[in-house]
From Swiss-Prot:
Organism domain of life: Eukaryota
Gene3D superfamilies referenced in this protein's UniProt entry, alphabetically: 6.10.160.10, Ribosomal protein L20 (1.10.1900.20)
PROSITE patterns: RIBOSOMAL_L20 (PS00937)
Organism the protein comes from: Glycine max
A GO cellular component annotation in the UniProt record: ribosome
Record function comment: Binds directly to 23S ribosomal RNA and is necessary for the in vitro assembly process of the 50S ribosomal subunit. It is not involved in the protein synthesizing functions of that subunit.
Keywords: Chloroplast, Plastid, Ribonucleoprotein, Ribosomal protein, RNA-binding, rRNA-binding
PANTHER family reported in the protein's UniProt record: 39S RIBOSOMAL PROTEIN L20
Name of the encoding gene: rpl20
Descriptive protein name: Large ribosomal subunit protein bL20c
Lineage, top ranks: Eukaryota, Viridiplantae, Streptophyta, Embryophyta, Tracheophyta
Swiss-Prot/TrEMBL GO biological process terms: ribosomal large subunit assembly; translation
InterPro entries on file: Ribosomal_bL20, RIBOSOMAL_L20_CS, Ribosomal_protein_bL20_C
Entry's localization field: Plastid, Chloroplast
GO molecular function: rRNA binding; structural constituent of ribosome
Length: 130
């Protein structure tokens, strides 16, 4: 095989990768092979965790709503029944908005829940067994 002289092209490619990993510690920012592997690993983790973040936030919103709803003595409602009632009542409130209301203005959430309770079928309320 003939020798391929890359010269500045290879250096340019390695420099670009080095700039990406310049904040990494130890050999992960110095050795070319390790740099390449760590760059791939970092990009894979970033891609995976973007989806993971969406799942984590949805779980956080659900647990916040459930904690506030169950904490009230006057209106004992569980999360699943609340979301079902919001859905059947065609209220355009997603979990993120309801969680913000639950944290910042609990009275508003209880007003919404009471309104749903008055208009909905009482069988859907939580009484120990559904």
């Amino acid at each position: 095989m003939t020798r391929i002289k890359r010269g500045y092209i290879a250096r340019k490619r390695r420099t670009k990768i080095r700039l990406f990993t310049s904040s990494f510690r130890g050999a992960h920012s110095r050795l070319t092979r390790t740099i390449t592997q760590q760059k791939i690993k970092a990009l894979v983790s970033a891609h995976r965790d973007r989806d993971r973040k969406k799942r984590d936030f949805r779980g956080l919103w659900i647990s916040r709503i459930n904690a506030v709803i169950r904490g009230n003595i006057k209106v004992y409602y569980i999360y699943s029944n609340l979301v079902y009632s919001l859905y059947t009542g065609q209220l355009l409130l997603n979990r993120k908005i309801v969680a913000q209301i639950a944290i910042l203005k609990q009275n508003c959430l209880f007003m919404i829940a009471n309104d749903i309770i008055k208009t909905k079928n009482p069988l859907r309320l939580y009484s120990g067994k559904v």
